[in-house]
Amino acid sequence: MSIVLAYSGGLDTSVAVHWLKERYQTEVIAYCANLGQIEDLEAVSKRATAAGASEVIVEDVRDLFLHDYAIPALAAGAAYEGKYLLAAPLSRPLIAERLVSIARERGASAVAHGATGKGNDQVRFYTSVRALAPELDILAPVIDWEMTSRGSEIAYADRHGIDVGVSKTTPYSIDTNIWGTSIECGDLDLIDHAPPPDAWQITTAPVQAPDRPTTITIEFEAGIPVALDGRKLDLIDLVSELGDTAAANGIGRTEILESRIVGFKSRGIYEAPAATVLLAARTDLEALVLDRETLHHKRSIADQYAELVYYGYWFTDLRAALDAYCARLAHRVTGTVTVELYKGSARCIGRTSPKYGRYSSALADYEEADTFLHEAGAGFAYCWALPLTEGVVTR
């Protein structure tokens, strides 16, 4: 058999290439998804080859990731436990789908990942692959091998001449893509202490951000951001540029003591500058273009959608149905939002939607231009209170 391994270029998966090859006496195909991570992907490819991979596939999936995974989550307003914008969990079903596709193309009988037994990712990969290809074996070398610490993995790499580019002093576990960065482990496990300043990877500390606000405009068409400050951009460029601007202003930092899939709580800090601003802007625009009942109901699905993503239940009818629901409303989410970025805060200060906006200044005005029928309001209040009034009689 041959094995297709989800390869990141880090310690775990670099050791896994060699370990899988030796353990199963088979070829290991290393698959690395370009999701906009910071690493030098050419160096990552060379590292996989040096570790023993028979083939290395590096694939640019940034556009696919944004359009098919990040934007649907944005449309749903998904934030796990009200905070986490899910950059890493959103990438896992995409990686799993590509692993399955490559395994079928190459005739491989197994796929593998570098997740640990106590982490969320091993559940996400297992669940996604089982949903797509139950006939494939799913290998988890980090769970199966005899190495029990980061130090023992480094020692294994040294014994076998595997260059992993890390040391025992590396304090954090970091996962980065174009939608955001997650940071765990190290001193972050001391939950009664503030995160060390060096834990944050891409955002400026709000107190050190510029002393003058940065004002930007974001244009949406059918729910998708298409322009920044009046300039039409493809989605990759828009998210990248917005992310740089927001990060420089200290936007997108989140700290959460989250409830993991496997049953215990862990502390993570997350940076999602572009996603934070886009969610604020899209939510603000929805308030302008959606009627009250639709707006309130749509916001009620945000937690459920976030849980589906976090739990690894991407390939479910429920997630697809929620996407269809959001897509039905998306055409109205067309307009422009002005956002002020200042020392960690993204504040929507203006919005317009000439075609779908539901705001009427003539109705909302309390001055002479007021066109609201006040006598009708009094009658409405009487009818609105009737259920409560009648209840008093029967109680």
Curated annotation (Swiss-Prot):
Compartments where located: Cytoplasm
InterPro entries the record matches: Arginosuc_syn_C, Arginosuc_syn_N, Arginosuc_synth, Arginosuc_synth_CS, Arginosuc_synth_type_1_subfam, AS_cat/multimer_dom_body, Rossmann-like_a/b/a_fold
Highest taxon of source: Bacteria
Entry binding sites for ATP: 6-14, 33, 114
CDD domains per UniProt: ASS
Reaction catalysed by this enzyme: L-citrulline + L-aspartate + ATP = 2-(N(omega)-L-arginino)succinate + AMP + diphosphate + H(+)
GO molecular function, one term: argininosuccinate synthase activity
Chain residues that bind L-aspartate: 116, 120-121
Gene Ontology BP, a term: L-arginine biosynthetic process
EC id: 6.3.4.5
GO CC list: cytoplasm
Associated pathway: Amino-acid biosynthesis; L-arginine biosynthesis; L-arginine from L-ornithine and carbamoyl phosphate: step 2/3
SUBUNIT field: Homotetramer.
Family: Belongs to the argininosuccinate synthase family. Type 1 subfamily.
Name this polypeptide is given: Argininosuccinate synthase
Lineage: Bacteria, Bacillati, Actinomycetota, Actinomycetes, Mycobacteriales
